[in-house]
Amino acid sequence: MSEREEVILDTSMGSIHIELYWDHAPRTCKNFYELAKRGYYDGVSFHRIIADFMIQGGDPTGTGRGGTSIYGERFADEINPGLQHTGAGILSMANAGPNTNGSQFFITLAPTPWLDGKHTIFGRVSDGMNVVKRMGLVKTDANDRLFIVQKILYALNAVDLNKEL
């Protein structure tokens, strides 16, 4: 795996290492990678968690309605039929319908085949799945909002981390 393929999300519960699928969703990977590099995700909370489904973050407003991409407000889907939501640890773009990708993303906690063809899959958790699973157990209210805020403390690109060492 190339260093440029990985982003590390250091969260309030621990580190989540993300392998990006550059060959399958290059624009989506570039968006996520660049937003992480620019510090866009630093201090941003996971604003929605649904047990046995997914954890969602990437909205700096924390409302689930905010966030923009590096390409402007929204950009097109990169749906690859060879990639499916087959289990826990799949990284996909959250959206409000076709071609409405911004900065929000989610990580699955279980198979979610009904999302196939509707959300761009652009990576997977390569390390830190225990953190994702623990986060999936956090208590939420009736609107799937967390009682105890869980944040991305900072997001790092593996190549940048290696430069610092």
Swiss-Prot record:
It catalyses: [protein]-peptidylproline (omega=180) = [protein]-peptidylproline (omega=0). One of its GO terms (biological process) is protein folding. GO terms for molecular function: peptidyl-prolyl cis-trans isomerase activity. Its EC number is 5.2.1.8. The keyword Heme does not apply. PANTHER family: PEPTIDYL-PROLYL CIS-TRANS ISOMERASE-RELATED (PTHR45625), PEPTIDYLPROLYL ISOMERASE DOMAIN AND WD REPEAT-CONTAINING PROTEIN 1 (PTHR45625:SF4). Belongs to the cyclophilin-type PPIase family. PPIL1 subfamily. PPIases accelerate the folding of proteins. It catalyzes the cis-trans isomerization of proline imidic peptide bonds in oligopeptides. This is Peptidyl-prolyl cis-trans isomerase-like 1. It comes from Rhizopus delemar (strain RA 99-880 / ATCC MYA-4621 / FGSC 9543 / NRRL 43880) (Mucormycosis agent).
